């Protein structure tokens, strides 16, 4: 029965992944009337969203979708696989084809916020997938789309929400929240982690109070959503089933503190292109963007690794990319569950925290860090940097190595190898240093982990940009093998991270002469696997249950399934060292039922856990 369920999941997924992208949109024509309304009754919705005029919200979203439908119908049919489309003029834009990377599925309720909310049936009342709006926000964000009808001063300004009432729409120095009786221990744990994070890196005090006039009610609703900014009185923040994780909680709390989505920035077309053929019509408004008059980003660049950036396949009708990074090496970085350094910096600007640390008497931070508003003598550092002044490698797992002109190898495997989600990532920080006036070249020789938007379950981050405040390139697919990056400086931080099964990376590095063009240079090659390697993190699991008879599994688990045609075998990617199946069997006997990879004990449906 176990094998039947797993093979059913595997081949169903493979079949769905081959849907024709042009057929999905019927040559760009969206029928707005076919969009289903919420699966929840209006009476229940009115209780769930007491601060929102549901009829007005639905009409505003429908109007926005109709506007988008008109735009799309005006565009000629085209092949969207290897090209993006400019939102403003509909012109085809040739881009480097994306490497094929079939996505894994880990959680039955959905691995991403969009998947969870789609299953909850909230598509017709949430803006951009997870935001609840007040009447005033509906008016300024959705209804006032015409520049000639509403003055710039009266309109919403975002990524950080700044309307005509700013800064009174922020929380000031104190934010209050309380837990509804529906909040489970998992919700409390995830939200407390998000509270601790945002509080530690800003001047905002986030405290529990069930009596404060303005407060957030944290509860278990259907899906994940929040209001944007402080709306006065009690406002809801839902962390339903599938949302009880740090990344989602930090994202929703980011909304409550005043953040909108990164992909709605007015300048987003310079950084991502939209693949309209793959968009689920119910979520077409998710890709709405602002103008330069309505968008306020505090002068900060677009960060693909922002906690407020949706994943590349978000709102997809066919599991294919709806957003394509113009720097395609950033494709898997989008959808992160880490809070980006620019998120932290922008939140500090939005709440005027940086004004608390006078430049003359505060820490002189290195590598783009800034003084902590909690203690101006120490710095808040970009990822990959630590120490009081951001001039040291973060403590713990990792190492500092010196690059020479000869290729050297860095190899590590982190994670326990078991298909259970952990609350926190295991992290290893490496510094690769070249001699002064030389650059570092990094090549991914091997990578085994779970492949998913944002690499939220594990992967490797490589920081070669001149601006070290930006999130680095993140990878979590064996298809990324033989990717090469050349740094703009003599130091490259590398971060290996994991919180599900295991992640193994084999990286090669050497010192080279800097390129003439020092702006984010890199070279990529098609993946070539010459040695006998496992290309999936769960090969031992498949062998344990006799699944090596499958040609598909043998091709991805050559070492474990003994399907090698040469003697250059290496146990790349093995999760259970020394083939210790007795330990794996002990885990199987005492498994965590919350993340049972074989079948769901409640409805006997298979976990979608495959290549």
From Swiss-Prot:
Residues 82-95 have a biased composition (Polar residues). Residues 1-17 form the signal peptide. One of its GO terms (cellular component) is extracellular region. It is found in: Secreted. It holds the Pfam family Astacin. The active site is at 252. Residues 397-516 form the CUB domain. Binds 1 zinc ion per subunit. Zn(2+) binds at residues 251, 255, 261. Its main location: secreted. Its EC number is 3.4.24.-. Expressed in excretory cell and in amphid and phasmid sheath glia. Disulfide bonds join 203-353, 224-243, 357-376, 379-390, 397-428, 455-476, 532-564, 539-557, 548-561. Residues 340-396 form the EGF-like domain. Residues 159-354 form the Peptidase M12A domain. The keyword Zinc applies. Residues 532-564 form the ShKT domain. GO terms for biological process: molting cycle, collagen and cuticulin-based cuticle; proteolysis. GO terms for molecular function: metalloendopeptidase activity; zinc ion binding. Its cofactor is Zn(2+). Glycans are attached at residues 53, 67, 200, 424. Gene3D superfamilies: Collagenase (Catalytic Domain) (3.40.390.10). Keywords: Cleavage on pair of basic residues, Disulfide bond, EGF-like domain, Glycoprotein, Hydrolase, Metal-binding, Metalloprotease, Protease, Secreted, Signal, Zinc, Zymogen. Metalloprotease. This is Zinc metalloproteinase nas-31.
